[in-house]
């Protein structure tokens, strides 16, 4: 190897050794730290155990009118579907050899998932517009249509997580952090 190539190689190696130190010493200085109080309004996650459910309450009897006004145009009368997905029916359709109808009553494992989804995404044209009482009521109505809760059963942060969905045991737990 010529002296010139040795010099180039030595410069290259010095740069490779120095680069990590230079790169870690400089930061782009973008943004600013965010306080937990600023994150709280965005943290609307609700777990299967009901952690994160807001105060409020509702019944299927109260939810029927809310459903008719906010949901029926897309999910059909009594959750039958058309033009969008059915919310009701499909019991027993997850068995082998049958085409599955994945509805709230046949597929979803937790009632809190229904509340969480409606809270985040519905009604489609005006998501996040329903207050907690309306959310509990329309959730109760959909669960009532699926014969999971009674028309006058009160759903709230304490009772909603206790609702036993028909397919709760139909999923295999998968540990994400073994």
Identify what each model region corresponds to.
Residues 55-59, 106, 110, 127-130, ...:
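Extracytoplasmic/periplasmic, Sec-exported soluble proteins
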Residues 10-21:
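Bacterial N-terminal signal peptides
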Residues 23-27:
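Boundary at the C-terminal end of the N-terminal hydrophobic targeting segment
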Residues 63, 67-77, 87, 138-142:
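The canonical Cys-X-X-Cys-His
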Residues 36, 125-178:
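Flexible coil segments in periplasmic/lumen-exposed cytochrome c-class electron-transfer proteins
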Residues 60, 64, 80-119, 123:
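Gly/Gly-Pro-rich "capping" loops immediately C-terminal to redox-active cysteine motifs
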Residues 30-66, 123-126:
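Electrostatic cytochrome c docking/interface patches
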